Structure formats: C-alpha cells, structure tokens
C-alpha cells in the first residue's frame, strides 16, 4: 500500500463483497446475517485488522448498525483497529454502534474522491458497502482490488452486491484479474486486482 500511495497519491482501495452464487448480498426481506460461514467471516476480520480505514454508507450503517471493528473468532478485538468511516448526508443516532469508542469519522458527502481526501494519510482503505457506495467507487474508477467471499447458496432475488454504474455496453466493463483463490470452509475467497493498464489500477504492494 505504501508504494501504491507514492505512485498514485491516494490510498489503495479494496472493495469487500460477500455474495451467494447468484450475486445476492441479502434476501428479499433484507436479512443478510449470515451469507457466509464462520471461516470466511474470521478471514474478513483478519483483513480488517491490517487496514487503515473501513468505509460504509449511511444506508448500511442505519440498516445493519455494524460495529466495523476487527475481532478474533473468540470475539476479542485485534490490537489494531481501523478508523470507522460512514459516508452520506444522513446523521447516525447517538447510540449507533459505529460511534462507540475513538476512531469514528462521518464524511457528509457521497463523493468517493472527497472520502479519500479526508483519508489522505491512510495507506489501505476497505469499502464494505453497501451496493450504492461500492457502485459509486467503481464509477469514480477508485476500486483497485475486490475481496469476494462466495457462499454456495442461491437466493434468486434480493439486493445485488454492486449498485448502478455508468456502464451501457460490454466494452465499458471494468476488468480485474484473479490474484488469490482460497477455500474458507464451504465458502470461496477470491481477490481480484485491477488489470494492469486499466484505469489507475493496482501496481504494487
């Protein structure tokens, strides 16, 4: 991440999604806990323990009331905790889990570039969703990696992992290359990195 920031003048951005085989992150009634199993969730928390900041939109913050902390499988916190960032104009209630403890930021903007400007001293930023904010970062060409946790299940309907993007034809697609594939219990973890020469993209780490 340090070399990436030196070259591009901004943090490395990883988008994290957890979906069923048919690309859903929640059932039609909105339930989403849990799409993936305990091994995948433990893996995601270990990654959280190494990043500088974790970003969600106000929709996710208000709907799920997440803590966004990095916790070991036994529930104990990791020594390093990421800065918890919520983006959007709606305020969170005073008792929101995100507000507990130090390291909380609210960026009152939907602009991904504005979020990264606030986080300019960070090396590695994780965008955890929901679909609107991930779609916004994709549209802004500001996703360098995707951490995809794939659960062996079908929902058929429900929320998609990435919101609407300004892509109208196949040639507009944003291309990533598969970098890591790991089995995590019944789930599959795949890290994709932006294909070299495609946008800002990933260069080094």
Task: Walk through the language-model features, giving the residues of each.
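Enzymes that bind and transform nitrogen-containing heteroaromatic metabolites
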Residues: 3-5, 9-205
């Amino acid at each position: 991440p340090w070399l990436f920031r030196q070259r591009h003048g901004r943090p490395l951005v990883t988008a994290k999604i957890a979906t069923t085989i048919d690309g859903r992150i929640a059932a039609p009634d909105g339930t989403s806990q849990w799409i993936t199993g305990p091994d995948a969730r433990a893996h995601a928390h270990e990654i959280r323990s190494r990043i500088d900041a974790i970003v969600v939109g106000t929709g996710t913050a208000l709907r799920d009331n997440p803590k966004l902390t990095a916790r070991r499988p036994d529930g104990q916190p990791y020594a390093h905790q990421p800065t918890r960032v919520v983006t959007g104009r709606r305020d969170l209630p005073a008792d929101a889990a995100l507000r507990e403890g130090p390291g909380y930021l609210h960026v009152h903007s939907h602009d991904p570039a504005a979020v990264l400007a606030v986080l300019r001293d960070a090396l590695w930023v994780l965008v955890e969703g929901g679909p609107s904010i991930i779609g916004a970062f994709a549209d802004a060409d500001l996703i360098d990696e995707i951490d995809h946790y794939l659960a062996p299940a079908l929902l058929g309907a429900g929320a998609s992992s990435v919101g609407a993007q300004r892509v109208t034809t196949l040639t507009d697609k944003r291309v990533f290359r598969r970098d890591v594939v790991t089995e995590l219990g019944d789930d599959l973890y795949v890290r994709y990195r932006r294909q070299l020469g495609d946008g800002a993209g990933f260069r080094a780490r």
